Amino acid sequence: MTKAPKPAPDIATLTKAKAKVEAMRLRLEIERHNSAYYQHDAPTVSDAEYDALRRRLEAIEAKFPELVSASSPTQTVGAAPARGFAKVQHAVPMLSLGNAFADDEVTEFVERVQRFLRLDAVPSIVAEPKIDGLSLSLRYEHGELMRAATRGDGFTGEDVTANVRTIADIPTTLKAKTIPAACELRGEVYMLKQDFLALNKRQEEAGDTVFANPRNSAAGSLRQKDVAITASRPLKFFAYAWGEMSDYPMDEPTQFKMLGWLKQAGFVVNPEITLCTSVDDALAFYRRIGEQRAALPYDIDGVVYKVDRLDYQERLGFVSRSPRWAIAHKFAAEQATTVLEKIDIQVGRTGALTPVARLQPVTVGGVVVQNATLHNEDYIKGLGNDGSPLRDGVDIREGDTVVVQRAGDVIPQIVSVVLDKRPADATPYHFPHKCPVCGSHAAREEGEAVWRCTGALICPAQAVERLKHFVSRLAFDIDGLGEKQIVLFHERGWVKEPADIFTLQARNAALKLEDIEGYGETSVRNLFAAIDARRTIELHRLIFALGIRHVGEGNAKLLARHYGTLDAFLAAMRAAAEGQTEEGNTSEAYQDLDNIAGIGEVVAAAVVEFFAEPRNVAALDALLAELKDVLPAEQARRDTAVAGKTVVFTGSLTKFTRDEAKAAAERLGAKVAGSVSKKTDYVVAGADAGSKLTKAKDLGVAVLTEDEWLALIS
């Protein structure tokens, strides 16, 4: 039985060792939320919770600056671009903004600017509503739109040029009299509230997924692979900034003057933007916009203040992930009181059990709210993400009168309970330890707040994502069987678990795949041939394909090399699963698994949870019955010049593909890493190597060309 996480200790009492562990936990959690927000357009926590996580991490790193790393979320922006779009390097990074949550913090921001610039008077400040949408960068050359990219991680975004050309607010040709030879113009893609409601109504009527809020709908609409879908969505754009400028279109440019030029160039600029000459003016604008917020046709989550003079901006510069010359003043969440009628459990595509409050309908900030996220078991019990008391430790029960808020216009959540209205018969909520969809047992890892269904191979709620993973490039990699086909076959009930893929041909007399639009006898024959070709598979690919939590490609290879053969692996996993008790696992098989270099307790526990679920074992047995052979692991050599060394490949390689280089290095006993650190022994740099090469040089890591690498391993 997994224990609930202990409350996080006060930062002032942390030792360096404990601070390192806590910082790592916070980084992983923040990175998960970044990925959900930036890559999948599906925020998993409120702005307030996210900000609390960031502030705790920032406080730890401030106390222990030696723990700060370049990859920390406090030093980076957003999340890496998704794989479905071409990558675009921003000529000037698209950084995020620091946040202020109180008037005093805005005053402190202005005072910092004055001290830095050694000014006696407050500099002019541009105040603008903070649009809750998707940041976009538009590159124009000689006035013509050449490329559009999302923010991504701030340095590399996604190329969405074709989709952006369908947005009426974005000119394909600049109209201003004076136009720079090259410029990157930036702003926010958003959707009007009324358009969002109409879109969700159409989605619901069509049986399609509805969006949580206008920001999600705008981001999801822009990041469509089918341009026609983007064109059908009512997307808008406000321009408010720029990146690279070959030259400015005026003498002595300022932020406010440049906004006027953007209007001349053909962009829509928010008419609410105001030039302020004092802190009081800026705060008055904040309060006025806050009062008008519900009546505005678009969602905003605060106000952005920017120093007006561009020469001041240049002198102020940046700190890691944000500019010194701008700050976002966030709004307090909007709240209302209602009754929580029921708590339901939803199972996500990755198996997470998420509690949802079903509420008596109530209007919050002009929007009718009927559901609110309860996040996890601890949140219901009255514990925050760090284990500290939340809502003064008051739990949430069915029948309670609760205060609901829309934090940052994202996902409604319950922030407090009106205890004097609690029904006498209201009982504490008991979080289910079984999946409500498939009945498999649920597990909660130590240090995490989420319960997850362990029926990875058989749970209908997870089926599509698990099957996509099963056929992915690093797993079974079946030619002609990708995400689109998996979704189609699953929707028709033909493929529910991995073994079903290998019985398609035997069932085709009844299924008749060749009758599906886009298929024919030749394509079906090729598909069956590709499936048959994967009836023989390498052990590490099979392990990776199972989709066990925390078992990526690297850990799958570690497991395969340790056990060597399928029989040895299965025997050890079943023995370890049989040794699982509520008190822990002291079996010899589990101890052996836990002691594998690079595996550790978290991964070992996840593997055992997988094999402790009988339905997973049954699904795996059904799969193995369809396979011809599982090839033993190729053991890494220990007698080479790179055995035990950590290697990073970067840039465009010409003598081999990245996968070939990685496989060859691993066969020779090297560990291939994805990022450069002090522990890196070699960086093999191809053409156009970027930040990894720079970091390697800064750290004094040995840098090799492809030829030098080949000479080393020959």
UniProtKB/Swiss-Prot annotation:
Top EC class, one word:
ligase
Reactions listed under catalytic activity: NAD(+) + (deoxyribonucleotide)n-3'-hydroxyl + 5'-phospho-(deoxyribonucleotide)m = (deoxyribonucleotide)n+m + AMP + beta-nicotinamide D-nucleotide
Q: Which GO terms describe its biological process?
A: DNA repair; DNA replication
Q: Which UniProt keywords apply?
A: DNA damage, DNA repair, DNA replication, Ligase, Magnesium, Manganese, Metal-binding, NAD, Zinc
Q: Does the keyword Zinc apply?
A: yes
Q: Name the positions where NAD(+) binds.
A: 47-51, 96-97, 128, 151, 188, 306, 330
Per the record, its GO cellular-component terms are: cytosol
Hey, what's the signal peptide range on this chain? none
Query: Key word NAD present in the record?
Result: yes
Stated family: Belongs to the NAD-dependent DNA ligase family. LigA subfamily.
HAMAP family attached here?
Answer: DNA_ligase_A
From the Swiss-Prot or TrEMBL record, give the protein name: DNA ligase
